[in-house]
Amino acid sequence: MQSWYLLYCKRGQLQRAQEHLERQAVNCLAPMITLEKIVRGKRTAVSEPLFPNYLFVEFDPEVIHTTTINATRGVSHFVRFGASPAIVPSAVIHQLSVYKPKDIVDPSTPYPGDKVIITEGAFEGFQAIFTEPDGEARSMLLLNLINKEIKHSVKNTEFRKL
């Protein structure tokens, strides 16, 4: 009888494991999430696995043995409870396939109103308040200089969130 199981894949080989398992007629699910991150100084949307290195697989152990799955390229091992691989309920798989999170931002990416510290440039060491993105590679910060608030555009690589 077909059931869902959870595999742990070797680091960086989730895609490889999924491709090889699908060639063996194993149904695979690797839920993805889109994050807004600052990569090389630019705000970009990046798609990442919701559960890094974990892959949900559906197969019948009477047809395809677990050792065949375990020996597949990119697969490290089954997640187990005791001696046998853990069976994941179909309701959990259904929820994961239906769930589509929106507007998720990397925790290190500042939101408007967050305090930041400037790490480079003329204002190095100053604390500021992040107000808004200014294009892909820059952001607007609110600086308090001599009791006067000044808006200043700074490269995304020149500050970090506190």
Swiss-Prot record:
One Pfam family of this chain: NusG
GO cellular component, one term: cytosol
Keywords: DNA-binding, Transcription, Transcription antitermination, Transcription regulation
GO molecular function list: DNA binding; transcription antitermination factor activity, DNA binding
Protein's UniProt keywords contain Transcription: yes
GO BP term, example: transcription elongation-coupled chromatin remodeling
InterPro entries referenced in this protein's UniProt entry, alphabetically: NGN-like_dom (IPR006645), NGN_dom_sf (IPR036735), NusG-like (IPR043425), Transcription_antiterm_RfaH (IPR010215)
Disruption phenotype: Inactivation results in increased initial adhesion and biofilm formation.
CDD domains, alphabetized: NGN_SP_RfaH
Family: Belongs to the RfaH family.
NCBIfam families referenced in this protein's UniProt entry, alphabetically: PRK09014.1 (NF006534), RfaH (TIGR01955)
Function per UniProt: Enhances distal genes transcription elongation in a specialized subset of operons that encode extracytoplasmic components. RfaH is recruited into a multi-component RNA polymerase complex by the ops element, which is a short conserved DNA sequence located downstream of the main promoter of these operons. Once bound, RfaH suppresses pausing and inhibits Rho-dependent and intrinsic termination at a subset of sites. Termination signals are bypassed, which allows complete synthesis of long RNA chains.
Subunit: Interacts with both the nontemplate DNA and the RNA polymerase (RNAP).
HAMAP family in the cross-refs: RfaH
Protein name per its UniProtKB record: Transcription antitermination protein RfaH
Taxonomic lineage of the native organism: Bacteria, Pseudomonadati, Pseudomonadota, Gammaproteobacteria, Enterobacterales
Originating gene: rfaH
